[in-house]
């Protein structure tokens, strides 16, 4: 999937509203992930995954801020996410299917927080963007 100029504009515009709330939005998306897909907790056995935990807030912030970096380098995701791709492929060995699950919970969280801005076109743009990010993150898997 190729992001159009209007897709890119929608992603960057919404990112401006997400950035100040990155940790809270990330924590909420992770909490949704763990509640909806409990099998994903296996990668976080060392985390406190309870509501409001510092672990959820810290890691959620990392996830969402990484998406912000990707949005800033939307035309060169391979380079922007190379280090994260290595980490997920060689060290963490996250099941690639989990990226789709997290993508879904991120979109639900964005829709709840930004219901006016997260219209059908913006949702479609974010869906494509998150799919491209997942493709890059899993590109080094063997």
From Swiss-Prot:
Keyword Cell membrane: no
GO terms, molecular function: haptoglobin binding; heme binding; iron ion binding; organic acid binding; oxygen binding; oxygen carrier activity; peroxidase activity
Tissue expression as described in the entry: Red blood cells.
Domain called Globin: residue spans: 2-142
Sites where the protein binds O2: 59
The keyword Iron-sulfur appears for this protein: no
GO annotation terms (biological process): hydrogen peroxide catabolic process
Keywords of the record: Heme, Iron, Metal-binding, Oxygen transport, Transport
Binding site for heme b: 88
An example Gene Ontology CC term for this record: haptoglobin-hemoglobin complex
Subunit structure and binding partners: Heterotetramer of two alpha chains and two beta chains.
Function recorded in the entry: This is a larval (tadpole) alpha-globin.
Recorded family membership: Belongs to the globin family.
PANTHER family from the UniProt entry: HEMOGLOBIN FAMILY MEMBER (PTHR11442), HEMOGLOBIN SUBUNIT MU (PTHR11442:SF8)
Protein name: Hemoglobin subunit alpha-4
């Amino acid at each position: 999937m190729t992001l159009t100029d209007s897709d890119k504009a929608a992603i960057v515009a919404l990112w401006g509203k997400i950035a100040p709330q990155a940790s809270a939005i990330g924590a909420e998306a992770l909490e949704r992930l763990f509640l909806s897909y409990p099998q994903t907790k296996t990668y976080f056995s060392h985390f406190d995954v309870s509501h409001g935990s510092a672990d959820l807030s810290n890691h959620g912030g990392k996830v969402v801020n990484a998406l912000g970096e990707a949005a800033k380098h939307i035309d060169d995701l391979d380079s922007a996410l190379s280090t994260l791709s290595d980490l997920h492929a060689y060290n963490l060995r996250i099941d690639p299917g989990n990226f789709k699950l997290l993508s879904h919970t991120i979109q639900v969280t964005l829709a709840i927080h930004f219901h006016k801005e997260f219209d059908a076109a913006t949702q479609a743009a974010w869906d494509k963007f998150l799919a491209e990010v997942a493709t890059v993150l899993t590109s080094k898997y063997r």
